[in-house]
C-alpha cells in the first residue's frame, strides 16, 4: 500500500496537480484549515482536521470549482524558545527542522495542498509586512503603549492576554498567573466592538456556539454611569456603571475593584484590607469572577444616595468587580442580583425589594424585570420605563448619563520573549517613542543570542537593542517586546492569495479569492484567533489591502481525537504501545505488571495517550488512516481512536482491490477480451451465469435472456445524490456509510450465480469516483486499472439520473378502521382501483371485514390504505 501511495504522491507532485491560477473562468472556492504550529510531528488531531479539509477541496474541484487549498506554518512561539534553552540552539534551527519534517508528513498523507503558496510566519519576508501594518495602525492611533496591569506567567516569563488565562493559569505553562504593572502595546480592537458584534448575525455559515461565544466575549452592556458622593468628603465621588440603574433605590452597598484609585487616596490599609487586595490580585479575568466565592472587605468609607441624602451606603472592596470593566465600581442591589445577594448575606448588608415579586428576596434574589416598588418617583413603572426615567434624572442633576460598555478590552500584543516578530518601535530619551522608518523594515531577530531561561533575551542582548534614533540620530533603544503570535495568524489567510506579493497583499488576488469559503479548525479559537482575524480584516479593508470586511464566510469546528489513558502501579503515564490487553485486563508488555486504564481523553504529550502517525502509516497506510478519522464519528464530534477501527478501514481498502480483481475477471469472461478502454456504462446488458461453482466456470446469456439489476442501479444513483449532499453538509461519516453500503451491494451481486456485469462494473466505477476525496491513493490506482485515461483528481463528480431513483415497487400499510392489519408490495404502475381491489381481498383484511362491505376506502398515495367498515 505504501508503494501505491508514494507512486501517486510523486505523480501529483510532478503534475503540479493542486496548483491553481488566480485567473479562471471557473467559480472560485477557498477552503482553509487553520495552519499548524511546527512542533515537530503531525498528530492525529491535525490529520483529522486536514482530512476534512482535503475531502472538501477535492470534492469542490470535482464539482467544477477553481479550488485554493493552501498550507503554511504559524512558526513563532514559546515552544521553540524553550527547546532552544534546553538544547542550547537557536529557535530558528529547531523551527525549520520541524517544518521540514512536518511538511514531509503532510505530503505522505496525500493532502491536496498548493505548496507553491506555502507561508512561514517566522520568515522576515512574511513578518516585514505585519511590521509595516503595525506602523500604519500606530499612525491611525489604533496602536498605543500604556502601563497596564497585566497577566504575568511566571514560568514562561511573559504577559498573557485575558483569553490566554484558563482557570487562573497560563494556557500553555499551566502556571498560576500573577498580576503586574508593565508598559504594554495595545491594539484598539474596542473601536470595532460594535461592528464585530453586529456582523455576527451575518455569519450564517458559522456554528451557533462560536457566534454565541463571540457575542458573550464582546459583551455589550447598555446602562448608565453616575456618581455617588463620599460622605463627609462631598468633593470626592465614586463613579459607578450599572446595567440596571432603575434599581437604584434598592442599593445596599458600593462595590469597588481591588485596584480602584480611591483605595490609595482615602482608604487606610489595615492588614485585613491588604491581605484581601493581594488575594484579589490573583483573579485574572471576568471568567474567574463567575466561579469564585463572592467576598468583600469594608473600606471604612460611605457614600450618600443620589436621590436621598439620608441613605448612606458602605463602600466594599469586592473580588467580583474588575477595574477594566465599566468604571471599576458598581452599586450592589442584593434583592435583584445573585452576586450582590451572596455578598450581602455574607456581610449582613441591607437587602431591599424594589421590583414587585412574591419571592422572599431576603433568601433568594429576584433577577427578572417587572414593576418598580419602594422606589420613590419610579414606583409603578416597568423596568424599561424606570431605566429611561432614572437616566433622565441623572442627566438633569448632571451626575450621570446613558453609557454603553463592552466586556471586550483592547488587545495587549506585547510579549517579553525572543522568538516572535520584533515590534518596530524605538525609544529615544529626547524624542520619545519613534517608529522604525519603512525603509528599515524588516527589523529582524539576531542570530547571536543566548538563552538562560530568564526574561527576554532581546532585552539582555549586548548590541541588538542599541540603535540611533531615526529623528535626532542620538543613541536610542529598540523596543525589546515582540508581537503576540496571534498577530501573525490574524492575516495569513490573505497572504495565500499571492504569497509572493511585494506588499502585504496582492489586492487583485484577494478580491478574487476572499472571503475564505470554508475555514476549518478547533472551537478553542473562538474568542482569540477568530475574533482577532475579523478585527484585522476590517482594518486591512480600511488600509485598502482587501475589499472584504469579514474574512471567513463559512466556519467548521471539528471535534478532538481521543484515546484511553494508562498508568502503571506507580502512577506513571504509559504510552499505548507499552500496554497489552489480556481478557478484560491491561498489562505492561515488558514486565507483565498490571496497568490501570484511565479516562478516554484528548491525546496529549503529558498523558502519553498519543498514537505515532508514522507507525500507523507503515502498518496501515495513509488512506486507511484518513478513512478512519472521517468515518467513525460526525466530524464536529470527538473521535475515539481504537485499533479495531483502523483495522476495519484497512480491510475495506483491501476489499476494494479484491472487488476490482473479481470485476476484471467477470468482464473478461463476458467479453473474452482485455479489461481496458471505455468504462462508461454500456447500453447493452449482459449477464453471466455460474456454470460450476467448484471450477468458477461461467457462460454468458444471450442478450434477450439478460437481466438488469434495477435495485443495484437505483442504489448507484441514490448514492451519488446523497454522498454529494452529505459532503456539502459535512456529514462525512454518513457519506462513507452510504459508500460502504454500495460496496456491499456490488460485492453481493458479484457473488451471485446470475450476475449483471454491466451494472456491477458501472457501479464500481462510480464507487471509486465517490471514494476519491476520502481515500485518494488507492482510488487513483484502481481508476487507472479500470482503463480510464484521465486522472481521477481531474474527473468530474458523477452525475445521477433522477428518474433512476424511482423504485419499481413500494410497500403500503393496510388498515381497517385506522388499525394496521397487513402490508402489501405494489408495482409502481398499479392503479387506485387495483390497489383497492387487492387490499380488500387480502386474507388478514377479510378476517376483520367479517363479510361486510367496506363503507369507504381512503388512500394516502404510496403510504396507507385505510378501509372503513361499520
Swiss-Prot record:
Its main location: cytoplasm. ATP binds at residue 605. GO terms for molecular function: aminoacyl-tRNA deacylase activity; ATP binding; leucine-tRNA ligase activity. The keyword ATP-binding applies. It comes from Rickettsia akari (strain Hartford). It is an enzyme of class 6 (ligase). The keyword Cell wall biogenesis/degradation does not apply. It catalyses: tRNA(Leu) + L-leucine + ATP = L-leucyl-tRNA(Leu) + AMP + diphosphate. A motif ('HIGH' region) lies at residues 36-46. Keywords: Aminoacyl-tRNA synthetase, ATP-binding, Cytoplasm, Ligase, Nucleotide-binding, Protein biosynthesis. PROSITE patterns: AA_TRNA_LIGASE_I. It comes from the Bacteria. Belongs to the class-I aminoacyl-tRNA synthetase family. One of its GO terms (biological process) is leucyl-tRNA aminoacylation. This is Leucine--tRNA ligase. GO terms for cellular component: cytoplasm. A motif ('KMSKS' region) lies at residues 602-606. InterPro entries: aa-tRNA-synth_I_CS (IPR001412), aa-tRNA-synth_Ia (IPR002300), Leu-tRNA-ligase (IPR002302), Leu_tRNA-synth_edit (IPR025709), M/V/L/I-tRNA-synth_anticd-bd (IPR013155), Methionyl/Leucyl_tRNA_Synth (IPR015413), Rossmann-like_a/b/a_fold (IPR014729), RPE1 (IPR005728). PANTHER family: LEUCINE--TRNA LIGASE, MITOCHONDRIAL, LEUCYL-TRNA SYNTHETASE. Its EC number is 6.1.1.4. It is found in: Cytoplasm.
